Amino acid sequence: MSIIRTYTIGTVTDWLRAFALASFAITAYAAPYIPKEDSVVLEHLPVRPGDPVARELRQLRAELSANPRKRDTALRLAERYFALANAEGDPRYVGYAQAALKPWWDLPAPPLDALVMRAILKQYSHDFYGAMQDLAAATREDPRNARAWSWRAAIDMVQARYEQARNDCLALRNIQSDLYVAGCIAYLDGTTGKAAADYRALSEAFARSGENSPEIKVWVLTRLAEMSLRMGNAKQAEENFRAAYFEPINDQFLLAAYADFLLDQGRPDEVIPLLVDWVRSDILLLRLALAEKALKASKAAEHIEALRSRFDAAALRGDKLHQQEEARFNLYLIGNKEKALALAQENWKLQREPRDARILLEAALAMKNPAAAQEALDWLERSGHEDPGLRATAQRLRALKP
């Protein structure tokens, strides 16, 4: 598949970022690089020299260099870097965003716009407590701040605080559009046993909303695909994934979800052309390597070693931001079941999304140790999550003799 794509920098609605990050970005990146000096040359952006995005970033960097305390410029630059990190899967851009906010980063009560941006960057580094403190302060100061409520919902979802997430979504009712609110509630209810009803609700809200940007279309279609899978409808899921894929934007969250679908369907040959140009992104390189190993492709060993090097470097830094992905790497690419289980258990302490449960259940099954995944088994029953594959794995795990 090939399609001309664009980079969407600074245009993606915050709720789309928030819920997309709840799916992948919160769980999967290496630590962002933060320059120690303002004069450090960062990275040549992966866009064409004449691209308007590159021109805007150069201009913003020049403006901020001339006046580092100009908050409007700093925030615009941080936003652009953060959006680029989302589009490209390169966490270094989050470090650059944090560097742009340096004058406000350690203030106890920064201005509202800087406070919310700081929270967004904190959650990226898994400082969920710090991020929620900032977001709580933001919603106290401005109860109609949709951005802060959206990110609160995203973090509450990642940590399986479903009632709090529902309250966050409901706070958006008089602030944002019907599609906005439907998307928030569908993300919650689609995880907690109401996939069919919320598929209908989100589909109807999407149809009523009229013309939407490619970003909104991709987000909604990806969520509809995920809900289709939870209903056991692979055909419908693929239709939604493909419709999202052919929107003319880069979206690594869609690519990761679509690649997982293809891998689960036993179609690794379709994953390679999908992800071959995405080796900079850890989450996508992992899926590419899984496909290559399944096909015994020549690049598999190279990409497995690249991932091993990245995970080893993260361990030396004390970086624990990507334990779910590292667990999957250990279990399926290098066969270290013990380490996979330990990583999956450690990851579950902080993150309790369906994919976090999946790797914990699968690692425990590989080790024939149901007790090791008891918390994930309890979550599955308590949440009512419907995914047939997850429930089948749980059933196999429960069937093991103690």
Question: What are the residue ranges of the model-derived segments?
Answer:
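Short coil turns that delineate tetratricopeptide repeat
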Residues: 68, 109, 143, 176-177, ...
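Canonical positions in the second alpha-helix
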Residues: 63, 100-104, 137-138, 171-172, ...
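Start-of-helix register in tetratricopeptide repeats
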Residues: 72, 79, 113, 147, ...
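Structural motif corresponding to the intra-repeat A-B loop/turn of tetratricopeptide repeats
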Residues: 84, 88-91, 125, 159, ...
